[in-house]
Amino acid sequence: MERSISFNPRGDNELPDDRSSDVGYAANDRRLAYSRSFQQSHGPRTPAVTEAAKPFLDRTVSSIDMPPDIYSVDGSDVFFGEGKDVDMAKVSVLEMVWEVFGVVTSGNRQMKRLFLLIALNVLYSTTELSIGIFTGRVGLVSDAFHLTFGCGLLTFSLFAMATSRKKPDHAYSYGYKRLEVLSAFTNALFLMFMSFSLAVEALHAFIQDESEHKHYLIVSAVTNLLVNLLGVWFFRNYARVNIAYRKAEDMNYHSVCLHVISDSIRSAGLILASWLLSLGVENAEVLCLGLVSVTVFMLVMPLFKATGGVLLQMAPPNIPSSALSKCLRQITSREDVTEVLQARFWEVVPGHTVGSLRLQVKSGIDERPLLQYVYDVYHDLGVQDLTLQTDYT
C-alpha cells in the first residue's frame, strides 16, 4: 500500500504562506491530501459495469469536507473560490494592458524607474529611426531597431514585475513569480546573442579591414550612453556580476541592470574605437568590439546559468549537496525506515524551495513521528514545501 502525503506539522488553521490567503482554507493546500493504491490478488480482467466495480475510494463518497466554491459541482471550470463571474477568456488585451499600467503607476520605485527608462529609450529610438529613414542612413536605422528590440525586452521585464504581484489561481497554483525568472533569462539570452553578434562584427571588420567611423554614429553612441547611464544609476544596487538571489524580483532587477550596463559598454566601445582611430591606431575597431564582446559575455554568464538552473528545476544552489546527503543518511538510519527510494528538491523561484520524498517504511508503524522528524530535518535546510510518499514493505 502506498500513501502520498504533503505534510506540515503546523496547525490546521495556519497557512504556510500567503499563496493560499485569497482562496480560503485548503484551496491549494495539500497537507491533508493523500492517495492510496491497493495490490489486487487477481489478474487483469475486463471491468464489469456494476455498482461493485466502482473504486473503493471514490470522490463522491469522500468523508473530507470541502469548503464551498473550491471545486465545481456543476461541471464548470471554476476552481479555488474564484467565483463564477470570472471569465479570463473575455478579458481583452486592452484591459490587461490598462491593468498592468495601473499596477506600474501604483508600484514601487523600481517599477516607476524602469517605466521612465523605457519611455526615454522609446523616444530616442523613434527619433533615431525617423532621422535615419529621412536621411537614408542605414547605420541609424539599424541602431534604432537594436534599441527597439531592447525596449521590448525591458517592457517584458516591466510586465513581469507587474504580473508577478497577482495572487495564485487554479491555473498557476504557485503564483506568477516565475515570470520574473523567465524575463531575466530572456534578457540574459538577448545579451548573450549581442555578445556573439559583436564578436562576428569584430571578425568582419578584421577581414574587410574597415577602420572608419561615421560621425553621426558617434553622436548616436554618445546619446545612447547618456540614456543608459541614467538606467545604471536607477538600478545601481544591482550593478554586480554575482548576486545572492533571495527573491524572484532580484533576478529581474539584476537582468535589467546588466542590460543597460551592456548597452553602455557597447556605446563606450564605439566611442573609444573612434577616438583611437583618430589617433592613428590600426584595427582599433576590431580591438574594441572584441573587448566589448568578451566583457558582456563575462557579465551575463552567471545570470544566464542561474536563471537557466531555476527554469530547469536544478537542485537548489542555496542548499549544499552534502547537507542533502546528510539528511538522507539521518532518515535512512531510523529503524522505521527501510529505504529512501526517491528524493527530489528544486526551486520554484529563488527563496522558495520544494521537495518530494518517497520512503519505504515498515508496515504497521505510526507515521506521525516519522513525518514530523522528516519535516523538521528539511525545514531547517530551508525547504518550504515537502511532499512525502510512504510505501509499506
Swiss-Prot record:
It comes from the Eukaryota. One of its GO terms (biological process) is response to nematode. The chain crosses the membrane at residues 114-134, 140-160, 187-207, 215-235, 260-280, 284-304. It is a multi-pass membrane protein. Pfam families: Cation_efflux. Residues 1-23 are annotated as: Disordered. Residues 1-113, 161-186, 236-259, 305-393 are cytoplasmic. Gene3D superfamilies: Cation efflux protein transmembrane domain (1.20.1510.10). The gene is MTPC2. GO terms for cellular component: vacuolar membrane. GO terms for molecular function: zinc ion transmembrane transporter activity. Residues 11-21 have a biased composition (Basic and acidic residues). Belongs to the cation diffusion facilitator (CDF) transporter (TC 2.A.4) family. The lineage of its organism: Eukaryota, Viridiplantae, Streptophyta, Embryophyta, Tracheophyta. Involved in sequestration of excess metal in the cytoplasm into vacuoles to maintain metal homeostasis. SUPFAM superfamilies: Cation efflux protein transmembrane domain-like. This is Metal tolerance protein C2. Residues 135-139, 208-214, 281-283 are vacuolar. It comes from Arabidopsis thaliana (Mouse-ear cress). Keywords: Membrane, Transmembrane, Transmembrane helix, Transport, Vacuole. Its main location: membrane. It is found in: Vacuole membrane.
